[in-house]
Amino acid sequence: MEMDLNNRLTEDETLEQAYDIFLELAADNLDPADIILFNLQFEERGGAELFDPSEDWQEHVDFDLNPDFFAEVVIGLADSEDGEINDIFARVLLCREKDHKLCHILWRE
């Protein structure tokens, strides 16, 4: 799988794409109570944060997670508006190379 450093999603595009996928699939993967909580609280405490892929993705995928091309987006709620997300609803692994559409999601259990 050949990837081009000059053909990557920006950080903002990556966050936006991950959030769009989350919204599209949440109803099929989260409890209705969690969806209600998320929708009620997102405006004040919600967020999406971009990270390099964490090591534990290796348990779920069988390819190299080069941080130049892969990102993890954590979506959830924080205790305060500027706080760190500590109530995680989904962790989204995305390939940032535009010609290689790949997404894997670990949902809240």
Swiss-Prot record:
State the Gene3D superfamilies in the record: dsDNA mimic, putative
InterPro entries assigned? dsDNA_mimic_put, Put_dsDNA_mimic_sf
- Coiled coil segments of this chain: none
> Which family would the database say this protein is a member of?
Belongs to the putative dsDNA mimic protein family.
Q: What does this protein do?
A: May act as a double-stranded DNA (dsDNA) mimic. Probably regulates the activity of a dsDNA-binding protein.
What is this protein's name? Putative double-stranded DNA mimic protein CKO_01325
